[in-house]
Amino acid sequence: MGLEAAIIDNEVMTIRALAADDDRTVDARVAGPSALLVAKLHKLGERREKAPARLMDKDAYDVYRLLVTVPTQVLATTLDRLLEDDLAGGVTCQALGYLDEMFGAFDSVGAFMAGRAEELVGDPAVVSAACAALAGDLLTSVAGDVGPTSE
């Protein structure tokens, strides 16, 4: 579950060979950042509920990197579109619930995990706080009532 968003949020990209002397390319559809965020949040949320031992700091850090790298309004605009889609709407709403639960506060599990992933190279507290701030901004920017804390 959670991959439905990639059917809506995707684009064609040209993928090139890694070797400088290899000129092969292929055009392929790849998931957009909002679809990646939805999928990653489902992975984390489902593992938290069913297999906590399989939770990986790297997955939470991937959420952090998406929140930092992609402008909030870009994510929000696409997430609004996904919420309105018959196929992707339900899983997108659930993903935003996971975002709120797991990243919505500096001491929530996802924010803590993302910070822990930065332990040897940065400041975990800054990453955890940034997760909470960015998640809050995104949830505020997305139209409509989403997630478990909406009334």
Short names for language-model regions:
Residues M1-E151:
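Compositionally biased terminal segments of proteins
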